[in-house]
Each structure stands twice: as structure tokens, then as C-alpha cells.
Amino acid sequence: DRENTSFMESQNMQSGDAYSVVYTKDASFGMSICYDVRFPKMYQKMTEAGAEILVVVANFTKPTGKAHWQTLLQARAIENACFVIAVDQVGTKTELGFDAYGHTMVIDPWGRVLASIEEDKEACLMVDLDLSLISKVRTQIPILKNEREELEVHAFHE
């Protein structure tokens, strides 16, 4: 285990210039990768564009994954009242110099983990999603409707 390593995604990847929402006859999917999970506004914009399921494809290191992976994913599900399907690579990434975390999971709009795979295991998940839960949660907790982006910040200094 290489517990003290990190991976600078920006050294190997180039950022995109738009968010992607894919519409199918069954559902709409907001697509994202790895480091994107740290940007809540991105997921809010995809949700406002109609995403019902937020997909995160990642390659988190073990230390970062253990500390942040599930918490970030549950936050994105709750903030947007969406399902989250998050897949993370497993095993040693010799060429990148770190061990990947794994722990693929599916989370519902309440933030409940519906299914997951242990952090060092390779497996497949099959989960039936009840998309009607999205509207139920959004009715009970209308976060997206109650957002007040017009408010200003007033800073007070000593």
C-alpha cells in the first residue's frame, strides 16, 4: 500500500469546456469524472438540465478515497435529490504510482447507499432504481426550488 501518495489529475488530463447530460428513453444521466465530484455547482447545473442519475467514473487514491469518496457522493445525491452511480478503479496503478481505492456504489436521492462493492474487490452491481423516488424527495425537500442565488455575501472584518 502506498498510503502517502496523491495523484494530480491535471498533469495527465485536460479539463472539458461543457457539462454532459445524456437523455435516454428510460432516464437522463449527468456524466462526470473523478475530481469533478468536488464541484457541487457542476452537479446542480446538470440536475437543472434534467439529469436524474449522476454518474461518476473515477480513479481515487486509497487515502483520498477512504477520507472523501463516500461523503462526497452522498452529498451530491442529497444536494440534487438524484441517484448517484459511482465507479472507481481498484488495484495498483504502477504507471501512475498509486493504489486505487475502488468502492463502487449506488446511492439514492436520500443519500442512502443502495449497493456497494468492497474497496479492493472487482465485481458488478445490478440495482433497480425507482426513479419516482426523485420527485418524492424533491417534493418533501425542495432544495432546488428554494435556492437563492441572488443573495449577496456581506463580509465583516475587525
Region spans (language model):
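CN hydrolase (nitrilase-like) catalytic-core segments centered on the catalytic cysteine
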Residues: 28, 38-124
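Proteins with a high burden of low-complexity, intrinsically disordered sequence enriched in S/T/G/P/A and R
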Residues: 1-8, 102, 107, 157
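A short C-terminal boundary segment appended to hydrolase-like catalytic domains
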Residues: 132-158
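A broadly conserved detector of short glycine/acidic/proline-rich loop/turn motifs that flank catalytic sites
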Residues: 26, 35, 110, 130-131
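A short, acidic, flexible beta-alpha connecting loop/helix-capping segment that sits on the rim
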Residues: 120-122, 130-133
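Active-site catalytic loop in hydrolytic enzyme cores
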Residues: 1-49, 62-71, 140-143, 153
